[in-house]
């Protein structure tokens, strides 16, 4: 069975007798899978909140190192301001621009499920936590002048305008993608953390990594429930998303050189992506599934 909306985009139905303008104003109605997963979302949200270790962006930004830019009478960024190794700043910029594109991922989750009740609470929480990462990364990097803020802003605008769309994914594909996507970013951050000497930045990247691990757990547990509800479709969904998952930053057109630098530094590359996918499939207990064995074997 395929869990997509009948008339609406992804997760809800709309009365066919309504005009187009009126239909767009109607409150969406959750479909079967959205309702099936709602108790699991509630359970996972409670666990997520009960186990949180709250942290704040301002605690990880050395504001005493900051100074005004030329617009306010100071001086603009210069390459000599950078003190971190290139592979570290490249990885940080990849991570930051990825986080800047959060709106697209939020939209796809809302369109595939529903921004109501416990689903709405989870999507709001996940979005807030992901946005925190963008806030703190940009604050740290701009205050410490480790990146060219003007060039970074140009890439941010370009990438956000390019956007992210997954409207061809089924609901289960969306969950499978999110679980593997979060795992990839967690591994990216852990490997980056291991190569940072500056203690504040090291702790910051570790915080982000922990959030990514917790997000992976949430989405992965929803997929685990889908395996009990519609196993065949879920296995197929995992296979489709595993086959197309890309390296972290691979979709940032302006940063392909940085993606190569990060790969050469051993932070994240195609080999590590394959390990991410294999480990996630194994964690779901699916390593012996015929359609997934291609992702397990080296």
Predicted regions and their residues:
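Short, positively charged and aromatic/hydrophobic N-terminal segments
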Residues: 2, 13, 20-22
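Residue-identity detector for glycine
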Residues: 5-10
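Non-heme di-metal
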Residues: 19-298
């Amino acid at each position: 069975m395929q869990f997509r909306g009948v008339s609406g985009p992804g997760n809800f139905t709309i009365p066919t007798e309504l005009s187009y303008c009126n239909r767009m104003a109607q409150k969406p109605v959750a479909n079967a899978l959205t309702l099936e997963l709602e108790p699991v979302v509630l359970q996972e949200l409670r666990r997520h909140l009960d186990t949180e270790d709250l942290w704040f962006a301002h605690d990880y930004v050395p504001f005493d190192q900051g100074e005004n830019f030329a617009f306010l009478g100071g001086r603009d960024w210069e390459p000599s301001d950078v003190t971190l190794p290139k592979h570290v700043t490249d990885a940080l910029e990849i991570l930051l621009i990825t986080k800047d594109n959060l709106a697209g991922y939020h939209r796809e989750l809302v369109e595939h499920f529903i921004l109501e009740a416990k689903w709405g609470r989870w999507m709001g929480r996940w979005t807030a936590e992901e946005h925190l990462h963008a806030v703190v990364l940009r604050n740290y990097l701009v205050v410490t002048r480790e990146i060219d803020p003007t060039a970074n802003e140009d890439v941010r605008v370009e990438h956000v305008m390019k956007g992210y769309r997954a409207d061809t994914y089924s609901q289960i594909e969306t969950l499978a993608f999110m679980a593997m996507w979060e795992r990839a970013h967690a591994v990216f951050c852990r490997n980056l953390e291991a190569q940072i000497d500056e203690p504040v930045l090291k702790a910051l990247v570790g915080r982000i990594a922990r959030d990514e691990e917790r997000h992976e757990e949430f989405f992965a547990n929803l997929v685990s429930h889908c395996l009990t509800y519609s196993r065949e479709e879920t296995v197929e969904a995992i296979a489709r998303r595993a086959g197309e998952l890309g390296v972290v930053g691979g979709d940032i057109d302006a940063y392909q050189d940085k993606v190569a630098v990060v790969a050469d530094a051993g932070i994240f590359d195609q080999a590590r992506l394959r390990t991410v996918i294999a480990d996630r499939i194994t964690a779901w207990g699916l390593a012996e599934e015929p359609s997934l064995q291609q992702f397990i074997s080296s």
